[in-house]
């Protein structure tokens, strides 16, 4: 009954409160879950454990965080890693030489680099497919084991119908893996839509403060959970206790941060659309976005990420060099507003023909909108754009 009551709680509450049993007086009544900064644990007698033996295997602080993330994604298990790429790297251990994966054509550059330069070397084959518009079933082979997508994608904000894709993957008995970093569990839960594994860069919205690195794998399948647990203890890729504490603290404000950032993003996207030096603004919250209706159906919000294309490369470069409060930096999902240049940053290692195919030109900028007062953000953008125009 207690578990049913907990699961019925709204996500804002679940961000702050795990089950009462997990916040019990056993921790001296601490409201903030303690940091167990210990590498190893004493045994009371031979053959008996406290439940923890060595922090590479498990640590109470990490376990608490993992239970929180699992609850937010409605999964049976979540595992915390030292970074998002560490999580994806371990996930690839599910596959063996000769296996084939279908991956979205528009992905984070780090994922593409891993697949092209590490996984392929290990004998895994990939097909790059525009999963939001192509018939994925046409690319499935006898040795296909999984489909890997982001939705929305990084950086072009393409949207894939998760439920429709899950029907295809289940029909062919292959895995559906969804990177949910851009929307976070607050706005979207892929497992509820049929995905088997959810990936997060916890560095982004879950942590939310640009002060630590983390990654997560979440699943609702016991067999996958058991495999991941074996791999994380064997490889030692688990997240350290203090970093777990920082991510846990960040999650407590996930709801208010996501709401505020989205509000700001909508206002900024509208303003950008009106600028004569802006050729295109890509934001899934616009009705003209091809994925708008899908987003309304499968998500609870549109997020705070947007991409815009300037009419000239020089305009893009000048904007990056003239912003002050808004920072020209990689990453996303923090309280600060950041502008990124995918061409030389997040997607620098992506082959040129793929960048061109995805529309990532030297005029494209990606913005992660933060939670500052939107008036201040707009005032800075107005000043910067005026300088860029030479006004």
What are these regions (language model features)?
Residues 2, 116, 125-127, 257, ...:
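PLP-dependent enzyme catalytic core of the Aspartate aminotransferase-like
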Residues 2-59, 65-68:
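N-terminal "arm"/small-domain region of PLP-dependent enzymes with the aminotransferase-like
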Residues 5-7, 20-24, 78-277, 282, ...:
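Conserved PLP-enzyme active-site core in the AAT-like
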Residues 20-22, 37-43, 182, 204, ...:
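Glycine-rich beta-alpha junction loops
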Residues 40-89, 93-94, 110-117:
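Conserved N-terminal alpha-helix of the aminotransferase class I/II PLP-enzyme fold
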Residues 40-41, 219-223, 251, 310-314:
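Short loop segments at secondary-structure junctions
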Residues 235-236, 323-333, 384-391:
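A common structural junction motif
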Residues 280-365, 369:
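Conserved C-terminal alpha-helix-loop-beta "cap" of PLP-dependent enzymes
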